[in-house]
C-alpha cells in the first residue's frame, strides 16, 4: 500500500464540501511558508517552542497525508480510507521516529477511528439480511459496506451518496475490485437533502458531524437519515467526544492512551494543521439529537479510548 501517493492536483474537491478545502492555486512551498509565518507570529505554546512546531510542519510536508492535511485541514475519502484500512506494521519499525509512522501507528484519534471502522463493519455485517438495501452517507470510498462479506446475502443493494465526485469515482473502482458493481448505485448529493425517502434498511454515516459545529444542523442531518430509513431501519453513525481539557464531561479513558502521542496529536491538529474536525459532542448530546430526530433504541459501542464512539439507533416501526 502506498502511503505517499496521490498528488494534490489529483484530489480535486467539490464546492460545498465541509471536510476538506478546494484551493489548489498555492504551491506546496508557498503553503509551507504561510504555515511557518503563522506559527512564528503565534509564538511558543505550552509544551512546544516555535522551532519545534516549525520542524513538525516541515515533517508534515514530507509525506502525502501530512501535505494533504496542511493544505486542506481535513481528510478526504482517499486518506480516510488509507487511515482506517491501514494494517499496523505496514510501515517498517525502522521508520518509528518519523512523523508519518507516528501518525499511522500511534496517534490516539487515528487508532480510535480505525477501531471505530472495525466496529462499524462488524455491526453492519450483523445487520445485513438477504434483499436488504444499505446506504453510506457520505460514502467516501464506501469501505464500511464494500468490504463486507455478501457471499450468503443475495439481493442486497448498496447505495453511496457523496458530494465529492472523486469519492464516488473511487467507490466505484473499489466496488469493481470487490465484484460488487451490479449491487452498487452512487449518487452525487448533499447529505442534508437526501432523496432516499423510506427506502433504506441500514444507513451508515461517519465523519460529517465532526465538521459541523451547529448542533441544529446536525439534528437536521439525523432527521434526513431518519427519513431515508424504512420504519424499523437502523442508523449506524459515530461522533468525536470532547477531550478532558475542553469538558468536565469528557469520557476519555486516559489509561488507554499514550500521553506522549496525545500531546503530539494536540500539537499537530490544533496548533499546526488547525484541523476542521474539532467539533466534539458527548454521549448525552448525541442521544438528545437523535431523539429529536425521531430515533429510538439508541445504544453506544465505545472504542477503547472512548474518543470515537459508534452509536446505533432505529427508526420506529
Placement of each model-derived feature along the sequence:
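Class I SAM-dependent methyltransferase Rossmann-like catalytic core
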Residues: 60-128
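Conserved SAM-binding loop of SAM-dependent methyltransferases across substrates and taxa
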Residues: 140-155
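Conserved SAM-binding loop
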Residues: 171-172
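A short acidic, Gly/Pro-enriched loop at the edge of an enzyme's catalytic core
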Residues: 192-203
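A short SAM/SAH-binding and catalytic strip from SAM-dependent methyltransferases
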Residues: 201-216
